[in-house]
Amino acid sequence: MQNKGLVICVAILLTLASIFYLSFSVATSFYDGQAATIKDPIARQDYKDSVKYLGLYSYQKCLETQIGLGLDLKGGMNVVLEISVPDVIDFLADHKQDAAYQKALEIAKQEEMHSPKDFISLFVDAFHKVAPGHKLAEIFATQQLKGKVSTQSTDEEVEKALREEVASAIDNSYNVVTNRIDQYGVVQPNIQKLEGQEGRLMVEMPGIREPERMRKLLQGSANLEFWETYNNQEITPYLTQLDQRLANGETKVDTAATDSTKKVQAKAAATPKFALNKNNAAKGEDAQMAALKKMHPLLSMLQTIPGDALSLVGYAYVRDTAAINKMIYGSLAKQILPSDLKLLWSAKPEDGLNKKNVYGLYALKVTTSDGRAPLEGDVVTTAKDDFDEHGRPRVSMTMNSEGAREWAALTKANVGKAIAIVLDGVVYSAPRVDGEISGGQSSISGNFTIEDTKDLANTLKSGRMPAPAKIVQEEVVGPTLGAQSIEQGLISFAIAFVLLMLYMIVMYNFIPGMMANLALIANLFFTLGVLASFQSALTMPGIAGIVLTLGTAVDANVLIYERIKEELKLGKGMKQALSEGYGNAFSAIFDSNLTSLITGVILLVTGTGPIRGFATTWIIGIVISFFTAVFLTRLVFENRVSKDKWMNQTFTTSFSKNFMQDKNYHFLSMYKTTFTVWGVAVLVCIVSFAVRGLSRSIDFTGGRNYVVTLNKPTHVEDVRKVMQGAFVNTVGENAGKPATTTVIALGTDGKTVRVSTNYNIDSNNPAEDDKAETILYNALKKGGFVSQASVQNFKNPDIREGGSIIQSAKVGPSIAKSITYNAIMSVLLAIFFIFLYILLRFRNIGFSVGSIVGLVLDTTIVIGCFSLCYGWIGFSLEIDQTFIGAILTVIGYDINDTVVVYDRIRENLGKHKHNLAKADIQKIFNDSINQTLSRTINTSVSTLIVLVSIFILGGDSIRSFSFAMIIGIIIGTLSSIFIASPVAYLVLGKKIEKRSKELAEVPVEA
């Protein structure tokens, strides 16, 4: 083998990198264990803040770098974001104070609570009632609707424009949230537009380790403002006076407030260094500190800055900000401080030793009559993170022409002063203006890290939403089926892995089997290491990618070993057999991996959420499995053989010696029968789609989910009987009709069920949620399944004894149009490019047609099995986003299997290239299928070992996935033999037959 040195170097680098990145997971687990022994929460946090892994990395960095589990496996953050449609309307009206407009707005808000109509219809109706004879154009002929609404516009035209703008605002907010969360890569966000709740988004984020940062990221409306400022020396005397008046007891201020009221969000500007009095940092209230606070209620906590510090007036510890806010924003402060003064905190704590919890207070000057900033962020057209001339991270911005003019005027009027750059009420930077800035090019610089600038640039370039997104619901969700299911899944996966290793030894002898097993372990180790380096969270679709990767890795070793067996059978020596075995297997391995890689790359580029997570893991696994199976194992084999070791090594055992050897099944002669069988199977699936449909989860149908723990183990059928007819719709076109309600068992303890219903799902009234929970409580209590004294206790997930709701959700269709479109397009593009690659690689359309026909039929049958089987077997077969991952895995496996068969057909056709017209094409196809039959069966069995183990031993959260995979592998294996190959034969055979006739008609010269 050539380039052995390069292979060794890459292997060493991969090993070291994987050890390094995976060590963060070990370190985090160790630190968490140590911290758990500390009872005092402050001391526990201090311990975490003090640790330095390897002397360099903080606990927070360890958290960020470790490989985590996704929301479906570990839990994470679940929020509902609301983009207020009334706020959007008010923005479009330029915040007019017209009495009729304001009254109509309030009426519409009240009616929206109980009306099925959308807000715009309610508002238009209310406006016509409140202001008869007046036109909507009088309100909405604003700068925001310039070009769409004029004073001459009709009410119909205005209403149309409002609908377009509101839809655009909601879509934009969806895109904003998607773009911001996508920065986390494989974290697999689940973003849903909640049907029936206009302007609401639900966002699930697995394994979020910094909820504060995510809250800022999600709620940041990119509401950027540029403010004029006071000089600190102008404001300090006022603060001193306020401090004295407070000390005199003119007003009562609670200076013992904790920092719980003030959660500083965002980042900070560059500021001069300072030193707080150490007494201020003391944790206890000693007599001296108490006396100091009595003498100086404000300035004992807020340290002012002597000298010229521009707009920065002082510093304070974050725990003191709540008390300071009460003083500087209180009624006494309004009497003393300038009326045009606006005090805002910095966004990020001051850097430096013992100053990570210290924030700056800035003095802004209000110069407009309406109290708004003189320049706002809607003039910013682009924003990107880069570095200044000193190599420090910053964010560069470009403004539009209007903003450039206003910015030039603003900077010209404030030369020598600071301009505060404020995002959502906190100061990011307050740089000194050295001169007029023209051209619209500016930058936000300060005490930033690279991560800070990336977050800020991402927020700014996402666009300025007319109404900020607000978190109206937030919860930390546990794993889908609990820790027990996860533990079962891990155990089953481990058992499957061991069985797979034993299988390779049984089939290929101890040494070759162990070599394949070591390659498998290395593949898994490297894959996890690379995922950890990406700071990825492992999700169920990600596991799908790993499962497919293991199959690909085993497949490569099986291909190599089967070719080596063939060479040894021909009487060749071990050195030659190894060389030719690896060489002859290379093209099949390369083609099968590349077709899988094509699918993965397209899914990564066009997919979102679970599809993207699956694709990322799959791509990593494909590349690494190719390296470990093709290069690492060969390196070891050749090293041993070069030392005259393993010269008599066999690649069979007594069990496998004659397995599928010298078989000659006539597969092609039975294609009519197999086509008929496949056609009937597909027809049955289509009929099932039409008659039974699919068991779609609320991800697709909308509805309410309640995961409930019961007070005793019970049969799920008994719960179904109790819930039957309990929910009756009271609103909408289904009023008076029973709501669709399903109950399934979760876990294995018999005490956890999930109740799903579409009860009043079309209602916009939040009170319906409480009604639904009350109905659920009454029904379960009547049946004796819960014994809580009140519905309030039943709704409290912390009160498990007696039964309670431990997780709930109300959703519309999960996969919004854009995600559905991207998912469909990604699969279609993958199929198209697979078709194109096989056409170019195999130089015949027959192979392309055969592979695509096989993929389409296989996918149809897998989905059809879910349609046929749901409700008949004892576990959920719902169609959800995890199922998408399973289908993609099936497609990847099937094309891998098919390409290997095609590669052998191509090789055998090449042996007859000079007399192909006279060759027996059917025999060549049959021989090729028979020659790869051992490989086909071994690969399928080895992968099925993994999946059957997971299916039997794993929890419910992975059972439907493994079920789909089992069906897909069985069908895909048969398809590569009985569908893909015969279709290719029929297309290729006709072409060769036509060529033979043409040659036969050519006259032979005498």
Give the positions of each predicted feature.
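Interfacial segments of transmembrane alpha-helices in multi-pass membrane proteins
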Residues: 2-4, 395-396, 400-415, 419-420, ...
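Small-residue-enriched core segments of transmembrane alpha-helices in multipass membrane transport
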Residues: 12-15, 426, 513-535, 546-553, ...
